[in-house]
């Protein structure tokens, strides 16, 4: 069906730290090895903060991210990874270090979720975001180090309040297959994601992607799939023959409940790669109304 050009996308939870108790002082790094191999397209971070108010007051101008301090991503032994293709300049993956409170708004639109303010409640408040990293790690695992913030970062009045925070990371990697595998590993691939309002009829999907790029696959993140059985995909207005959601792919996904808390979350549309020919990324015509989050894996140029 796909020929030799179709890559395979794998999504796996690779880092799930223990909860850290927030205190009134800065904590030391918590470092864990993340054994991830192959071509990483993105790291997807999930931040969870649980606050017990007591006599304290939650700072409603703060966000879940304020509970987290510095985050550093390193390769094995902190060595840079060099692109082995001698026909290009060597590409070194820089160490990503986000000092103090991460400022996600500096990332490209569609690659993060804007942090919402904390509410004055004792229930857990969760924020998820993506950091796109395009690098072929080959056999080099990466490690993630992070520190918890202090209580005053999320509380305007501490009192007897207590709080914990936890970091989870899902790694998305792409594994090319077939004759083009050797070349494909050196192409830039990124996950571009965005939320979309309810789709009831055929809708044009625009995600600010440039024309001329190749889209490898499209994944829909939905809260329920009880009625969602047929979706038509029409790049540049032409139906390319998508008939049904690939249920096999759904079962193959690991930790597919990571984003929305529902086991029906991921649906990878069974399509061949296609090129964006105009300002319309593609159109989706669902069989019934649903509200998706879209993940687009596309190729670009380094």
Q: What do these predicted ranges mean?
A:
Residues 1-302:
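Beta-strand-centric surfaces of beta-sandwich/beta-rich domains
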